[in-house]
Regions:
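Loop-to-helix element that buttresses phosphate recognition and phosphoryl-transfer chemistry
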Residues: 1-11, 58-73
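Structured helix-beta-strand junction loops
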Residues: 14, 42, 53, 81-82
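Short, solvent-exposed coil/turn elements at secondary-structure transition points
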Residues: 23-25, 53, 125
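Short amphipathic alpha-helical/adjacent loop interface patches that line ligand
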Residues: 43, 54, 72-76
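Eukaryotic N-terminal low-complexity, Ser/Thr- and Lys/Arg-rich leader segments
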Residues: 127-161
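Active-site-adjacent alpha-helix immediately C-terminal to a catalytic or transition-state-stabilizing loop
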Residues: 5-6, 73-130
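Short glycine/proline- and acidic residue-enriched helix-loop micro-motifs
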Residues: 46-66, 146-148
């Protein structure tokens, strides 16, 4: 939660800032702090199992995306009763919240591209949710991986795609 608190510190003082433990990042257990390559090298079976079923895969000593969705249920109910809100949290959590409000299958949430340094404005309406994205144009390394792909920052061997 350290990174999200650091991001939110720039919000004006009149914003009512709340910290909800339920919005913590997906707990990656023994893999916390490791890159995808380090996980692949140290825990090859776990890396393969996660690639096979990222939604249900639970890190050793950690959580799965399914666990995060269950953890977020009470928060989402609260969000639905709220007026305008701004959520500053981590990508996995944002993917789950985004999937809910965009009426997407939660089992596909791990592969949704929620870019870093982007404000995603969701406006619920009678016929669906309107989405507008505002990019901050801050340099960042994307670790997003589509299902069955390598992260954008990883360089596959020549001729391999």
């Amino acid at each position: 939660m350290r990174r999200t608190i650091a991001t939110a510190r720039f919000l004006p003082d009149h914003y009512n800032q709340l910290q909800w433990k339920a919005l913590d990042e997906l707990d990656s257990g023994v893999c916390d702090g490791l890159t995808y390559q380090e996980i692949k090298d140290r825990y090859p079976e776990d890396f393969a199992a996660r690639d096979e079923d990222k939604y249900n895969y639970r890190y050793r000593g950690g959580e799965s995306y399914r666990d995060v969705v269950i953890r977020l249920e009470p928060i989402i109910m609260e969000l639905e009763r709220s007026e305008d809100i701004l959520i500053v949290t981590h990508q996995a959590v944002l993917r789950c919240i985004y999937a809910y409000f965009m009426k997407k299958d939660q089992s596909k949430s791990p592969w949704m591209n929620v870019p870093l340094h982007t404000l995603i404005k969701l406006t619920p309406g009678a016929y669906g949710t309107e989405e507008v994205r505002y990019e901050a144009n801050i340099p960042a390394v994307s670790t997003w991986r589509g299902k069955g792909s390598t992260a954008k920052h990883e360089n596959p061997a020549p001729g391999v795609m």
